[in-house]
Amino acid sequence: MKINLSKSELEKTYRLLDTKEINMSVAELLFSIFEEKEFFMGAKSPFEFYGKLIEYWGVPRDDFEELKILEKWVKGAISPLNHAFFENNSYFKTVNPVPFKQGDYQLGYDTFKAYQPFSLNDIEVDDKDCYLERSPISYFTSDEKYLALSYKGEVWMSITPNEINTMQPYIDQASGNILVLGLGLGYYPFMISEKEDVKKIIVVELDQNVINIFKEHILPLFPHKEKITILKGDAIEYLAKNKLHYNYIFADLWHNPEDGLPIYLKLKEIEKRYTFGKFQYWLEKSLLAMLRRCLLTVYEESLQGYSVFQSPLT
């Protein structure tokens, strides 16, 4: 069914759709710079880093329209970090397991090279400017090590500035009895176990290998490990059968918004049936941005006369 809009409504709609396209293009650009990090390591300041971005994107210095996009979407979101970021974090001060290798799994330390770009935090969305998305990015001014678990030579789980920053709002809110869906390297359970007003933490994790590694090499280093109980199981199935009351339910079952969106939508349906406990979702702003892009794409096709079941490619 084709949608008919007034001229002013159509103008607003096209601004939304144009912003969505730029959001997606900038997101692809940022993903690519994290993959080709060596290109940016010569930068020594946010200004030089921004210049590298312009060079990487291939924007001519006289292309003011493209430069304006970079200025608006990216430049203000760049901020460097130093050693104090990790040095002052209680997890990093306390949890320093001895590296080991067991089968396909290896627990050890990876390194951010000086001026290597990375994602710093969840996206910032400006709902007053057509849902413009800015992704904070950063780099360290010196080489910095961080804990990582690799599987078959690929980093699978790690404790990075992005994980630290994106979890902090949920850590600040935590109190009482907490249900955690997904274990990882235990950053969130560790941080909330340090709080006096957090009494009990139940973690549901499906992967027995992850549980074993955590229990043997990481949990013994926790000062308040007595607060933490780990259950092997599927998070969705556990929620369907659960009879216990929790103050907060924190979901961390995905590596990124792309693989997390289907699980997030399932959990939102389950949340409707819970009369207790506040549900919280890691990277929720990014998950909602991903959903918004999908809905705007469907809406755009409807404007062009396509239905949800009729792709313009068929």
What is the predicted role of each segment?
Residues 207-248, 256:
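S-adenosyl-L-methionine
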Residues 255-314:
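C-terminal substrate-binding/active-site "lid" region of AdoMet-derived donor-dependent transferases
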Residues 176, 199, 247:
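Conserved acidic residues
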Residues 175-186:
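Conserved class I S-adenosyl-L-methionine
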Residues 144-147, 161-177:
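Conserved alpha-helix/loop element of class I SAM-dependent methyltransferases that forms part
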Residues 1-140:
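N-terminal auxiliary segments of SAM/dcSAM-dependent transferases
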Residues 200-205:
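Conserved SAM-binding motif I beta-strand of class I
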Residues 185-197:
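Conserved SAM-binding loop of SAM-dependent methyltransferases across substrates and taxa
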